[in-house]
Amino acid sequence: TGIIIKALSGFYYIDDGSAVYECRARGNFRKSGISPLVGDKAEFELSGGSGVVTAVLPRKNFLSRPPVANIEGFYSFFFENPAPNEYIIDRLTAIAVYHGIEPIIVFNKCDAGDFSRWESIYRAAGFRVFTVSAETGEGIDTLKSEFSGGISVLTGNSGVGKSSILNRIFGNTALKTGEVSEKLGRGRHTTRHTELLRLTGLSTILSNRASTINGRNRTGKQ
């Protein structure tokens, strides 16, 4: 038994705590209408150096985009240019709450903008809010301490600094980043795959763009 940490082209990479195994899924998953997802706890068998996923254990929650299951924290990232959009914040927090996931709001680059208005609005609504700077490191340690265990999803549009903050937390180059283009008003980095990045022995992170976040019925099949 292990956790699916990566899904790519029909292959599932399962971490059992000692090693990562490349596996295929059995055909009976298609008949049941259930597909293994990143974050799933799965049973698998090894034969001749390759693995087969034999069962997916019950999920506490899941999202269809990004395709990930068993999420503990849902972190939405925003920064000052363009200004935070209340509709997007509300949409993302609503998706998280509906699926039984705790939403956390993060405003990046606190040295370059004033987020007090949004902080007061969403803290008053009962949400946890953090203001950090990927450039100076301000607030990063406090945010890092929130990742106490389980799987966390980080979402936000390109250029908000998700990758830079991950690099600050990991202490190395976890993801490639690009400087924000002032002319285009957007960043050049785009997350291209669904994969969990290990933060500690108990905590893993998935980074995704806000525009691709979507939810499904909590009891629906995936």
Feature roles, as predicted:
Residues F78-N85:
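Short, glycine-rich nucleotide/cofactor-binding loops
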